[in-house]
Amino acid sequence: KAVAMYQKALEQKIDNNEKRAGVIKQLSDCYLAKEDYSNAIKYYQDYLTTLGNASANDAAALAQIYIQYADTLSDTARIDMFKKAEQVYVDMEKKYPDALEYVTFMRARVNSYMDPETKEGLAKPYYEKVMGMIEPRAEKSASDNARLVECYRYLGYYYLLKEDKATSTSYWNKILAIDPENEIAKQALTLTTK
């Protein structure tokens, strides 16, 4: 019902691009709520084009739709959708340099989704880059620490799989320095001492 209403609204002459973009976004949101990802993506792309001056948050939302869609797919189609999400982040890196840390972090996540068993280490360079951005800060926010824990967890697991126990151990210990009660790090350390 809402989809028909918004489509009818789009047929009307809307003299303001911002208002038109708002209607298009509502239409995309309706399709997203119905899990009709193809149409949600199509209309969201139309929204970004109509808006013209999209923010980093607007662009990132498109990547999130691709990620949600990928979660409903399998095999090659799933990977292809994750690659589309990553391409949004690549484009954001150029267009929104102030969002570099966020974009790099999200590229790490998307690459970890494409390599869930960490066999290829696709996310490794991105997590390392995020680490390099955050670690030098004298004051770290809760968000900074959460990102570091995710980086360290990925890298700790990566090196555990590579049987580099010393490097793996160093990452698990870094997690415990931030979160002394972290159960995953505690359990992983028992594996690195065997």
For each feature predicted by the language model, list its residue ranges.
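Flexible helix-coil transition and linker loops at the boundaries of alpha-helical arrays
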Residues: 10-20, 48-56, 89-98, 133-146
